[in-house]
């Protein structure tokens, strides 16, 4: 069988209520797979790349065709197994089991390196699924906008008395994830300078309104920043160039941003971080002809980039890693103090994780934006008193362009996810929305990931690298009846540095769906509260008690403490 990773084909998910599969429970993963490869969604859809370096939706186009065929023919009591983007089996299960189970990029720990993975990938034996690329629940840059917004807002609270007006953020990377940064900074009230080495990515973010304007040079960018901050305007500026050149140059000039981070694809030095002095075309060619030399050149440039970030940190500028493992890469190149600045989770996000709060998202399978606007209103109706959340939803409607099927991201926790899911299911039942809705999340969530350089960095009990938790999360979501469940390795931070799981559940308006939703959307965020309570976080222990979670050892510990 040929193994083509390139096809000149534009894929778009069907819209409306006409099924192309045998039920909405199989139509949903089919549409979401296709949506991941929509040209308005994916970074490089003709090569099956959704985002994050080489994060793919299917191993090759032949596998894609086979997945589509399998989903169209899947019965209501069958489950499709997908192994690193390849459909490998269809088995009889039962109607409340997942319709699809996915495992992507998983390697035995000793062999969990980019070198070994790339060998397997070249042989057609593996696929890098990132987080939501290979699990078919990517919704474009919106998927990370609110998390980035919450991070910037919390940084503003901690460092600038709660306001980022008149301040600016320095960052880099305008790919599928990094592309959220300029809009998130704007929504948080800050200007931003966003460095990106590929003009095509800047064009994509300008077209989708994630970035406001592009500067012609560094001097032009700084002049714009000076003007807009003086006026108190929150404008995002893109600059085409290499962060490994520009960030050190800013240090050399004595420029002082108000916040510094980075979201280049540093997790993948072979495909995701342009070495200094190279063109993108040269980078791609050398990745094929001299992979080891290319990796070394990229990591050397990352070291220069991180040293400049460290210099800003030493100046007292709030500086943090945004989860791309750039500190690790720099440390491997001899930057011994690379971890002197923190990751964004321990610095700003962990208290949310302790309450099971994370990136809850949903998609209107109808393709009708009105269905999303109606669900926005339903969220406000149910969560009446959360002004911060209402403000987010208002800003999202005003500023966020839908990519592919209309979708919404909304950070909510254990207390609310089940209630929202049941309400959405009732909206489908009553005809208030025109077609079923799928609910999912990023793998970056409170109980679904082990990533010592990102989500589980600096855990209170030292359990940063314990990956039992995402495995338990995937098992519990399978037992609870999620429509599809995924278990991945290497997302966000690269091979050897993370394991993580995802779930998606369909609201089709039936009683059976309501029962599954009630289980999944309680149990899934509850694993995050459990994980953090087990690690000794008081916020999580209190949340577990408030929500009536049965955590035997936490209860025993609390009893002994009393």
Swiss-Prot record:
NAD(+) binds at residues 52-53, 130, 176-178, 196, 201, 242-243, 263-267, 273-274, 322, 492. This is Urocanate hydratase. Its cofactor is NAD(+). It catalyses: 4-imidazolone-5-propanoate = trans-urocanate + H2O. Its main location: cytoplasm. Belongs to the urocanase family. The lineage of its organism: Bacteria, Pseudomonadati, Pseudomonadota, Gammaproteobacteria, Enterobacterales. HAMAP family: HutU. Pfam families: Urocanase, Urocanase_C, Urocanase_N. The active site is at 410. One of its GO terms (cellular component) is cytoplasm. GO terms for biological process: L-histidine catabolic process to glutamate and formamide; L-histidine catabolic process to glutamate and formate. Its EC number is 4.2.1.49. The keyword Ribosomal protein does not apply. Catalyzes the conversion of urocanate to 4-imidazolone-5-propionate. Keywords: Cytoplasm, Histidine metabolism, Lyase, NAD. Pathway: Amino-acid degradation; L-histidine degradation into L-glutamate; N-formimidoyl-L-glutamate from L-histidine: step 2/3. One of its GO terms (molecular function) is urocanate hydratase activity. It is found in: Cytoplasm. The keyword Lyase applies. Binds 1 NAD(+) per subunit.
